[in-house]
Regions:
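Active-site scaffold of zinc-dependent metalloenzymes
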Residues: 1-19
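A structural motif
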Residues: 30-50
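Active-site recognition of the HExxH zinc-binding catalytic motif
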Residues: 16-35, 72
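Metalloprotease/metallohydrolase-associated module, dominated by Zn2+-dependent proteases
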Residues: 44-119
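Soluble non-cytosolic domains of exported or imported proteins
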Residues: 13-17, 21, 62-67
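Mature, folded catalytic cores of secreted/periplasmic enzymes
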Residues: 6-10, 24-29, 53-54
């Protein structure tokens, strides 16, 4: 019985990692080019949101590669905060918002089609 329980937990963790990775990579392919400087736009609105967040980054990877990884690192957390807040602790939610509030508001302003995550 314990093996089955552990296998189920392992499978849930694997599925979460896969979903998070797919969101991260999909952000690279569908969003990056429109919001970073030197791509389709000058990135001014994104840069403004980042500066209003006092240069705080959600991960060292995002901090080290801000015009390549910041959006992709944030997007799974954005989905969690906006569409599945019951799946994260209030402490985690507060940490995400305290570091990225302006970026999250920027993503909200884009009116992205997130119907996949809505009931």
């Amino acid at each position: 019985m314990n093996i089955v329980k552990n296998s189920t937990l392992l499978w849930k963790n694997i599925c979460f990692i896969i979903e998070e990775t797919l969101i991260h990579e999909a952000t690279h392919t569908s969003i990056d080019a429109y919001h970073y400087p030197d791509r389709e736009t000058d990135g001014a609105a994104w840069i403004d949101a980042v500066s209003k967040d006092d240069g705080c980054y959600i991960s060292t990877y995002a901090r080290d590669y801000p015009y390549r990884e910041d959006l992709a690192e944030l997007m799974p957390l954005y989905v969690a905060v906006r569409y599945f807040p019951d799946r994260i602790s209030s402490d985690t939610r507060d940490k995400i918002l305290s570091c990225n509030l302006n970026r999250i508001q920027y993503l909200d302003s884009l009116k992205l089609d997130m119907s996949l995550y809505q009931n």
